[in-house]
A protein has these predicted regions:
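Glycine-rich phosphate/diphosphate-binding loops that line cofactor/substrate pockets in enzymes
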Residues: 28-40
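Glycine-rich phosphate-binding loops that contact phosphosugars or nucleotide phosphates
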Residues: 39-158, 162-172
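A short, charged, Gly/Pro-tolerant segment at domain boundaries
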Residues: 173-191
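HTH-adjacent hinge/linker in prokaryotic transcriptional regulators
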Residues: 1-28
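Amphipathic alpha-helical interaction segments
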Residues: 32-35, 53, 57, 181
Length: 191
């Protein structure tokens, strides 16, 4: 394959991932998830492996709007954090499979503590989805050989961006003020 053909192939994979996710994503589930986040004392953006990086990216995007968004490191720290949650807290967990042992330990512990769970996943019948209060589907299909592909990651980040935009639009006065403050704070970092 030529480089031009590879570029076209990669482009098609990104479009397929985003389009599949847009078609699978429920507007009602987005609204419900954002409502939970707005009402929460804290929102913990969590994941394992490559999904933890995506959760961190989503958390960083929300950081310009509120200090209530947090991450919690590796699976051990996530489990410790989950044990200290209560009914005022929300977990936003990213997991393509929705079926990993570490994720289930963390989600069960958070649920037992009273926290609400929002799961970004591809599988609506996964163990994690069955435990979640809200499931946000990433519709992009991935084979085991493509594990952690960048188009799939982009599809999850697309869902994260939808959440951020809904969060901002539901409270524009606060969001505008927060963005002004954080933008001003970052100006000193520019050359």
């Amino acid at each position: 394959a030529t480089t031009a053909e590879l570029c076209e192939h990669a482009y098609a994979r990104f479009l397929t991932a985003i389009n599949g996710t847009q078609n699978a994503l429920s507007a009602e589930a987005v609204d419900e998830a954002v409502h939970l986040m707005q009402e929460a004392r804290q929102v913990f953006c969590l994941g394992q492996g490559g999904s933890m990086l995506l959760a961190n990216d989503i958390c960083a995007r929300f950081a310009s709007l509120s200090t209530k968004f947090r991450t919690a490191g590796d699976s051990h720290l996530q489990l410790l954090t989950a044990s200290l949650m209560n009914e005022a807290d929300v977990v936003l967990f990213v997991s393509y499979s929705g079926a990993t042992r570490d994720m289930m330990e963390t989600l069960r512990t958070a649920k037992a503590a009273g926290a609400k769970i929002i799961l970004l996943t591809h599988y609506e019948d996964s163990p994690g989805a069955l435990l979640a209060d809200v499931v946000l589907l990433c519709g992009a299909q991935e084979s085991p050989l493509d594990s952690g592909s960048i188009p799939i990651k982009a599809a999850f980040l697309y869902v994260g961006e939808v959440l951020v935009l809904r969060y901002m639009l539901d409270d524009p006065a606060h969001s505008n003020t927060a963005q002004d403050l954080t933008s001003e704070a970052l100006t000193v970092k520019m050359l």
